[in-house]
Regions:
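Low-complexity, intrinsically disordered short peptide segments enriched in small/polar/basic residues
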Residues: 13, 241-242
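Conserved small/polar residues in nucleotide/adenosyl-binding loops
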Residues: 235-241
Length: 245
C-alpha cells in the first residue's frame, strides 16, 4: 500500500522537484511509444502522470498492461510541463508526475459506459450502475456543492442564534396534503408509524417548549405521483421563530 502524500487535485508549480505519492483511478491513458501518459483521478481532481521507458523500465512495463478504471498507487517526482502542454482547465495543468514506482491495487473489467462522458449512456443504464455514475465529475461536483450549501446554512443560522434540532423520522400519521408512507410496527401488531411529510408537529412542540429560534435540514416524504416538482422524498429547510423581534 502506498500512502498518499497529496490528492490528485492539489499539485502545482510549488511542488516541482518534490517526491510525492498518489492513489486513484485511471481516467485516460495514452501510449506514445517510449512514454505513457495517464490521467489519474480521485474525488479531488486529476493529475497527469508519466511513465518513461528509458528512466523507469519496470514501472513503464506495468503501465502498458493497465486499463481504464484500474486502481493504482504511484510514487514519483513532480516536473513542470512544457509551455505548449499546459492545461489551464484543471488545477494541476502546469505539472506532470514522472513515475518511478507503481502498485496496482485492483484491475477493472470494461465499464458499461464511458465514465468520462455521462451522455454516452441512457439514464436507466447509468442508474443500473449508479456506483460508477457517482464517479463522474458532474455528479461529484453536485455533492460538493450540496455540502457547501448546507454548511453555509448551518453557519448562517448558528451565527443568528438559531440552534439545529433533529426531530424523529417515525411519527404518528397526521393528515396533510398527500398520503403518508406507512411503516409497520414490529412490537405493536397492526399499528403503523408514518414517515413525516413535514416536521410540523415537532416544530410546534419546540416553539411551545421555549425554543424560539430553531432550524432543521430534514428529509420529508409524500406518497404521491412522482413529478419533476413533486419528488416522493425531498430535503426540507425549516426555520420557525417564536418571536420576530
Amino acid at each position: 500500500m502506498i500512502k498518499r502524500t497529496h490528492t490528485c487535485g492539489e499539485l502545482n508549480k510549488s511542488n516541482i522537484g518534490h517526491e510525492i505519492h498518489l492513489n486513484g483511478w485511471i481516467s485516460k491513458s495514452r501510449d506514445l511509444g517510449g512514454l505513457i501518459f495517464i490521467d489519474l483521478r480521485d474525488r479531488y481532481g486529476k493529475t497527469q502522470i508519466v511513465f518513461n521507458e528509458e528512466n523507469h523500465t519496470n514501472a513503464f512495463n506495468t503501465a502498458k498492461k493497465l486499463g481504464l478504471e484500474d486502481v493504482i498507487g504511484i510514487k514519483g517526482v513532480v516536473v513542470a510541463r512544457p509551455e505548449d502542454a499546459i492545461n489551464k482547465d484543471i488545477a494541476t495543468g502546469e505539472i506532470d508526475v514522472e513515475v518511478n514506482e507503481i502498485l496496482v491495487y485492483n484491475e477493472s473489467e470494461p465499464t458499461p459506459f464511458d465514465i468520462n462522458d455521462r451522455n454516452s449512456a441512457m439514464e436507466d443504464h447509468r442508474l443500473r450502475y449508479r456506483y460508477l455514475e457517482l464517479r463522474t465529475e458532474d455528479l461529484q461536483k453536485n455533492f460538493v456543492l450540496r455540502h457547501k450549501v448546507t454548511q453555509a446554512v448551518r453557519e448562517y443560522m448558528s451565527d443568528d442564534d438559531f440552534i439545529e434540532v433533529e426531530t424523529p423520522i417515525l411519527m404518528k400519521s397526521t393528515p396533510e396534503g398527500a398520503r403518508d408512507f406507512l411503516v409497520p410496527s414490529r412490537i405493536h401488531q397492526g399499528r403503523f408509524y408514518a414517515l413525516p411529510q413535514s416536521p410540523q408537529t415537532y416544530k410546534q412542540l419546540l416553539m411551545v417548549s421555549g425554543f424560539d429560534r430553531y432550524f432543521q435540514i430534514c428529509k420529508c416524504f409524500r406518497d404521491e405521483d412522482f413529478r419533476a416538482d413533486r419528488p416522493v422524498s425531498y430535503t426540507h429547510l425549516t426555520l420557525p421563530t417564536k418571536r420576530i423581534v
